[in-house]
């Protein structure tokens, strides 16, 4: 079972690939707003959402309330994989430390995605694919010779992050298998 609390493309890419390969994915969304990916629309249709949410079960849950916290903890205790892409430190601020995760489910594999990593100079800044594509130099390698940098027409950095995440999950040993 996969518990996905991520928003937008990178985390959804991971859980979408796992769901396509048969995993039971529970997508946890904010009440009333849902996943921000729902708002990426063309002609009032969110094609992104339809692609990335397929084969998943969706749950609206306010994890900042007592009832929401109780439900989330029950879900964590039955999950194999937990995916999140909050700004580093957010889960800890809400009381979800490594110690808490371990007490709920010592075999849980946690996938944490952030634009700038969990440590380092930019860790507290929100990260978006277009920023990463620009700062990495990728955008300057595309386009025409006499043109400025050109961003890709898709969420390329997020998709690559998601594919990297799912590859790591497929190749990582399960905590159950470690000594």
Model feature map: region roles:
Residues 1-168, 172:
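N-terminal helix-loop segment corresponding to the beta1-alpha1 unit
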Residues 173-179:
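A short, hydrophobic C-terminal helix/tail in secreted or cell-surface proteins
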């Amino acid at each position: 079972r996969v518990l996905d609390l991520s928003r937008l493309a990178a985390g959804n890419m991971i859980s979408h690939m796992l769901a396509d390969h048969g995993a039971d994915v529970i997508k946890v969304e904010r009440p009333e707003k849902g996943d921000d990916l729902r708002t990426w629309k063309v002609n009032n249709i969110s094609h992104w959402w339809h692609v990335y949410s397929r084969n998943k079960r969706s749950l609206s849950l306010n994890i900042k309330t007592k009832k929401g916290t109780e439900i989330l903890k029950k879900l964590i205790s039955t999950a194999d994989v937990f995916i999140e892409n909050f700004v580093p430190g957010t889960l800890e601020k809400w009381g979800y430390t490594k110690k808490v995760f371990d007490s709920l489910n010592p075999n849980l594999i946690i996938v944490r995605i952030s634009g700038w990593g969990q440590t380092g100079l930019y860790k507290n800044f929100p990260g978006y694919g277009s920023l990463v594509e620009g700062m990495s130099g990728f955008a300057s390698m595309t386009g025409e010779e006499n043109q400025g940098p050109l961003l890709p027409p898709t969420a390329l950095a997020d998709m690559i992050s998601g594919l990297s995440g799912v590859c790591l999950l497929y190749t990582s040993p399960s905590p159950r298998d470690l000594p």
